[in-house]
Regions:
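Structural signature of nuclease core domains in nucleic-acid processing machines
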Residues: 1-186
Length: 186
């Protein structure tokens, strides 16, 4: 209810001039609200069961960003500077070590595939994590890379049987929205 109220208030203040938007827009707006509620519920559950705390959103990795570029020396003496933006950075501090993970929000079905990394593909998240590890981040000491995760940000569509109970349906929804990636093995 609260999320819908916030969305509706934002919509009225910023996106309309008071006129009706039509049934199709109303439907899409309700779907957006449901998606936001699903994502917020997952975030609340995630942080209730984790030592990680979100510490940065849209973190800039750039020569003038909060974290410097990730630099790769080239054979000709030049330098390849990789820059970008991290959706979310989480930190868990334990025994003087700052465990850092980067999270990328995905509206599609992106899955982490180590084979792609092996062949030099889909390395963006790892490079961002390495930039934070190598260049430092705020006042965190003894940074240890803890992982990269893709987080689906969609309201999952699940196929159900007519007589399926709510618990089974919720389990299917959770399976479709589970974060995936690679994490440090404790």
């Amino acid at each position: 209810k609260c999320v819908f109220d916030i969305l509706e208030e934002y919509f009225k203040e910023n996106l309309t001039s008071g006129e009706e938007m039509g049934e199709r827009f109303d439907y899409l707006f309700r779907q957006l609200g449901l998606t936001v509620c699903e994502v917020v519920d997952r975030l609340v559950a995630e942080f209730a069961n984790s030592n990680f705390v979100p510490v940065a959103f849209e973190l800039s990795i750039d020569s003038d960003g909060e974290v410097d570029t990730y630099n790769i020396p080239l054979p000709d003496g030049g330098t390849l500077k990789i820059k970008g933006s991290v959706d979310r950075v989480d930190v868990a501090e334990q025994n003087g070590t700052s465990y850092v993970r980067v999270v990328d929000y995905k509206s599609g079905g992106k899955k982490f595939d180590l084979n792609e990394v092996f062949y030099g593909l889909n390395m963006q998240m790892l490079i961002y994590l390495f930039a934070i590890w190598k260049n430092g981040f705020r006042d965190y000491k003894n940074i240890t890379p803890a992982g990269i995760l893709y987080m689906p940000v969609n309201a999952p569509f699940v196929e159900t049987e007519r007589d399926e109970n709510e618990k089974t349906i919720e389990q299917k929804k959770l399976k479709g929205t589970k974060m995936n990636g690679v994490v440090l093995d404790d």
